[in-house]
Amino acid sequence: MLAGGQAMAGDLLQWQTNSLTYLYGKDFQVNPRIQQTVTFEHADGWKYGDNFFFIDKIFYNGKEDAFAGENTHYGELSPRLSFNKIFDQKFEFGPIKDVLLAMTYEFGEDDTESYLIGPGFDLAIPGFDYFQLNFYNRHTEGDRPGDDVWQITPAWSYTIPVGGSDVLIDGFMDWVVDNDVNSKGEYHANLHFNPQVKYDLGKALHFGEKQLYVGVEYDYWKNKYGIEDSQGFKTDQSVTSFLVKVHF
């Protein structure tokens, strides 16, 4: 979630923002049902593109996951190279204001590593702080299913003034559109929709804007982890979590 940014002096790093988020939610699927998560996020813009990184530390409230134990971690690193910046020309047409080479590295415990690459676009949509649309071809580490499938990932931010403060609606969606089958098993198309609705409490209390947020995160995941939902094993997830987020 790219909320706010701090302008930086110098030619290489143009802006950056860092944050810590605490989330508490119930009714997760596949993993233990109650989860507390601490997330570190970093985003920046630099001379030739932008970067986004996050890592989750997930606690299962004393329960044990079959593979990860009482806690686990998961993260993603997503650099993008901007054609506008690299070629010093405007690659703009219609709503598209920049064309990028988008990449993502997914990592965590167990067999989770994947490498994603494809075209990305920054869109100018009225009212939005930003709107990104990335198309990835996924490549898994090892021989597990889910290799060479396509994923569509929009990410967005929208600010609504409310009284003396703001409500920020931001988030992403990962939509893997293909199925894959190999000797190790099956991987099903899945959709992960993850918006946050946050109130700028810091601005309301005159601590400074875009520094302290409270709100909720909604996590919908159809066929979580690419596992097909069934009567015997539910993998369709719908969870609302409470959150507190601090930018620094």
Predicted regions and their residues:
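Transmembrane beta-strands of outer-membrane beta-barrel pores
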Residues: 22-28, 57-61, 103-109, 135-141, ...
